Amino acid sequence: QVVAGSTYRDSLVYKYNGAGQVSEEVYYVSIDGSPFADWAKNEFVYSGNGNLTEYKGYFLDVNTMNYVQASHILVEFDNKTNPLILGAEGILLEQINFVSANNVTKATVNDLEDPANNEVATYAYVYNDKSKPATASITFQSIGLPIPVTFHYQ
């Protein structure tokens, strides 16, 4: 990607825990052909049943060469089966709603740099006879209006 006359390339490295879940992703960036260098990272925390319950985002402070936490997302779940469980692939696709075994009911985003960007999303489901979501309503606190979702199964 070219930005302001410079060419940027990026790369991601994934670390896995003993359960085979992605526990960390590290972003590396190369500018104008320079060697790849650390840029940012995310850490993932799971519950005992495999639900992704925490997501911590960090950036690299180039002055100290230490990671500084910038965000913290807490995720809550129901006890019903998630209709699409992608596991690690959900993280690669940045679809954290499809990483876990159960359905997200609430996601609380804490922006540690600017609390004005904090957000809460709540999910309300109507389930079919197989205990999978038939419809959902997602409400973001900042917007206040429910967003309808319909699930289709084959």
Feature roles, as predicted:
Residues 1-154:
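Buried hydrophobic residues that stabilize the cores of well-folded domains
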